[in-house]
C-alpha cells in the first residue's frame, strides 16, 4: 500500500470516529480492522530509524573504542543505492553477478542478511572473483547488529570474500565464508570481531584460507574468530614476504594446512594475546609455521595443535623466534618437537613463559637443531616416546642457560625422568643462574667409571643441575665445569670372621665373648 493511500484511509478512519460511524469499545478505545493496523505498522517500520554503534552490538571492549548507540543507518536493497560516504544497512539479502567495488568510506551493517556472489570465473584472479573489492584509499567497515549475516560465494571456493586493494578494511561483526580465501589483504585490515570461517583455498599459487596478508601490508587482530579454513599453507592466516600480522586477541582455531595449520609466517608475526588452538598440519607447524623473518610472542596461548611430522605448536624453519610471554601447551607432533621444533637460527625464551604438556617422539617440549637460549621460563610436564622429554638437543648444537631456567618433571616412555637430553659432543653454556634454576640432565654418551660426561663448557655451580638417572650424579671437573658421572661406589667391608674356641672338647662359633674372658676348663684359644 502506498503512503498516499495509507493517509487517505487514516483520514477516513478519523472521520468515521468523529461521525460516530465506527463504534468505540468501552473506555473509548477504537478497534480498527486488522488489515489497516498491519499496513500502518509496516509503514511505521519502513520509516523507523536504524540506530546502533558501529560495532553492531554495543558489546565491543577494546582500547580506543567508544560506543555510540545513536548512529543512524540508511537502509539499502542493492549496492547501487550507495552513492557516497555513509552508514548503510541491508534491508534484504543481496545477490551479485560481479564484485561490488567500494570507492567511498562505507560502514555496512549486514542486519542479519547475506551478500552472495553468483557469477564468477574460476580461472580469474581472486580480485576479480571477490564479493567485495575495496579500492585504493577507500574504507570499508563491516558490522552486523544481528550477528548472523554472511558474505559468501554461491559456488564455493572460487574467489575472495573481501579483496582489499591498498584500502582500509575494518571488521566488527558478521561472517565471511564459502570463499577460496576469506580476506585477501593488500592494504590495512583491522579485525575486532566477527568470524572468518569455512573458506577453502585450492589455488596452488595462493596461500591462506582465512586471511592472506600481502607484501608490505598489515593485518591487526583485536578479536573475532578465524576458524575451519583450509589451504596449502596458512590454513588460518598466511603472511607473505614483507607482510605483517599483529595478534592482540581473538581466536584462530580448527584450521588445516600442509604447512602452518593456524598461521604461516614468511616475514613478521607479533603475538601478545589471543589463542591459536586445535589447528592441524599435514607436515609441520600445527599452530604456527615460521618460514623466515621474526616471530615474537609476548602473550597468548598456542595450545592443542597437531602436526603429523614436526612442531605441533610451532615449527621454525629459519628466522628468529622470541618467546617473552605466553604459553605453548598440550600440542602434539608425530615425530619431533611437540611444543616447538627449532630447525635453524635462534629460539629464545625468558621469564614468564611456559612450555608444558606437549608430546612427540623426540623432544616433547622442544626439539632443537639450531641455537636455543633459555633466559628464564619453565619447560615442564612434557613427554617423548624416545628421548628428550623436555628438550632434545641433537649433536653439534648450542644451548645457553641463564637466570631462572627450569627444565624439570619431563618424562620419556613409561614415566622415566628425561628433561634436558644432550646429544653427542654438546656442552651447555651457563650465565648467572639463580637459586630458582633447576635442570634435569640426560646424556646420549654414557658416563663410565673415572670417565664422566661434560655438561657445561664453563665453570658453573653443580647445585642447579640434577641427574635424571639415579645411577648417576652431578659433579664438577678440574676447571669447575659441571659433569655427569657414575656414583662413587662404597668400599666393600668383608663380613667379620667369628671367634672359635673349644670348650669341654666341643667347638663353638659365633659366641661374642668380649676382649677379656676366661675359659674354665678344656682347650681354648682367644
Name the predicted role of every residue range.
Residues 112-128, 143-159, 172-180, 194-207, ...:
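Beta-strand-rich solenoid/repeat architectures in extracellular/passenger domains
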Residues 486-526:
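Solvent-exposed beta-strand/loop surfaces, strongest in extracytoplasmic domains of secreted
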Residues 3-18:
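Sec-dependent N-terminal signal peptides
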Residues 18-31:
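C-terminal segment of classical bacterial N-terminal signal peptides
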Residues 88-90, 106-110, 132, 140-144, ...:
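Well-ordered beta-strand segments characteristic of repetitive beta-sheet solenoids
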Residues 74, 81-96, 106-113:
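Glycine-rich repeat segments that build the extracellular carbohydrate-interaction surface of secreted
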Residues 30-82, 402-491, 514-521:
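Extracellular/surface-exposed low-complexity segments
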Amino acid at each position: 500500500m502506498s503512503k498516499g493511500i495509507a493517509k487517505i484511509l487514516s483520514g477516513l478512519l478519523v472521520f468515521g470516529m468523529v461521525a460516530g460511524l465506527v463504534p468505540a469499545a468501552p473506555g473509548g478505545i477504537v478497534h480498527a480492522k486488522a488489515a489497516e493496523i498491519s499496513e500502518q505498522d509496516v509503514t511505521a517500520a519502513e520509516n523507523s530509524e536504524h540506530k546502533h554503534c558501529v560495532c553492531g552490538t554495543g558489546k565491543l571492549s577494546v582500547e580506543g573504542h567508544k560506543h555510540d548507540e545513536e548512529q543512524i543507518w540508511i537502509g539499502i536493497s542493492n549496492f547501487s543505492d550507495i552513492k557516497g560516504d555513509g552508514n548503510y544497512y541491508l534491508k534484504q539479502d543481496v545477490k551479485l553477478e560481479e564484485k561490488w567495488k567500494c570507492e567511498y568510506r562505507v560502514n555496512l551493517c549486514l542486519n542479519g542478511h547475506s551478500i552472495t556472489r553468483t557469477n564468477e570465473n574460476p580461472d580469474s584472479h581472486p580480485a576479480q572473483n571477490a564479493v567485495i573489492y575495496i579500492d585504493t584509499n577507500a574504507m570499508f567497515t563491516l558490522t552486523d547488529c544481528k550477528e548472523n549475516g554472511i558474505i559468501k560465494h554461491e559456488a564455493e571456493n572460487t574467489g575472495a570474500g573481501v579483496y582489499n586493494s591498498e584500502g582500509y578494511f575494518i571488521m566488527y561483526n558478521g561472517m565471511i565464508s564459502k570463499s577460496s580465501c576469506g580476506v585477501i589483504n593488500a592494504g590495512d585490515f583491522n579485525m575486532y570481531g566477527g568470524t572468518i570461517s569455512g573458506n577453502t583455498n585450492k589455488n596452488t599459487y595462493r596461500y591462506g584460507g582465512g586471511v592472506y596478508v600481502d607484501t608490505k601490508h598489515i593485518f591487526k587482530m583485536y578479536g573475532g574468530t578465524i576458524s575451519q579454513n583450509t589451504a596449502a599453507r596458512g590454513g588460518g592466516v598466511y603472511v607473505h614476504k614483507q607482510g605483517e600480522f599483529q595478534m592482540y586477541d581473538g581466536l584462530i582455531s580448527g584450521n588445516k594446512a600442509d604447512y602452518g595449520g593456524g598461521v604461516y609466517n614468511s616475514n613478521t608475526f607479533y603475538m601478545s594475546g589471543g589463542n591459536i588452538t586445535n589447528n592441524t598440519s599435514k607436515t609441520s607447524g600445527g599452530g604456527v609455521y615460521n618460514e623466515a623473518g621474526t616471530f615474537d610472542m609476548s602473550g597468548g596461548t598456542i595450545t592443542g595443535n597437531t602436526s603429523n611430522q614436526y612442531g605441533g605448536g610451532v615449527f621454525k624453519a629459519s628466522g628468529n623466534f622470541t618467546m617473552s610471554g605466553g604459553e605453548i601447551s598440550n600440542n602434539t607432533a608425530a615425530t619431533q618437537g611437540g611444543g616447538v621444533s627449532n630447525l635453524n637460527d635462534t629460539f629464545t625464551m625468558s621469564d614468564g613463559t611456559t612450555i608444558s604438556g606437549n608430546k612427540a617422539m623426540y623432544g616433547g617440549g622442544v626439539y632443537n637443531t639450531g641455537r636455543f637460549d633459555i633466559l628464564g621460563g619453565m619447560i615442564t610436564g612434557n613427554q617423548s616416546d624416545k628421548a628428550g622429554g623436555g628438550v632434545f638437543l641433537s649433536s653439534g648444537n648450542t644451548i645457553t642457560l641463564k637466570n631462572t631456567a627450569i627444565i624439570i618433571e619431563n618424562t620419556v616412555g613409561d614415566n622415566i625422568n628425561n628433561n634436558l637430553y644432550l646429544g653427542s659432543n654438546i656442552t651447555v653454556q651457563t650465565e648467572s643462574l639463580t637459586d630458582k634454576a633447576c635442570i634435569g640432565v640426560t646424556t646420549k654418551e654414557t658416563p663410565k667409571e673415572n670417565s664422566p660426561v661434560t655438561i657445561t663448557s664453563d665453570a658453573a655451580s653443580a647445585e642447579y643441575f640434577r641427574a635424571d638417572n639415579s645411577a648417576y650424579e652431578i659433579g664438577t671437573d678440574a676447571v669447575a665445569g659441571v659433569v655427569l658421572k657414575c656414583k662413587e661406589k662404597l668400599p666393600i667391608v668383608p663380613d667379620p670372621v667369628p671367634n672359635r674356641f673349644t670348650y669341654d672338647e666341643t667347638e663353638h662359633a659365633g659366641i661374642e665373648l668380649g676382649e677379656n674372658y676366661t675359659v674354665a676348663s678344656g682347650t681354648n684359644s682367644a
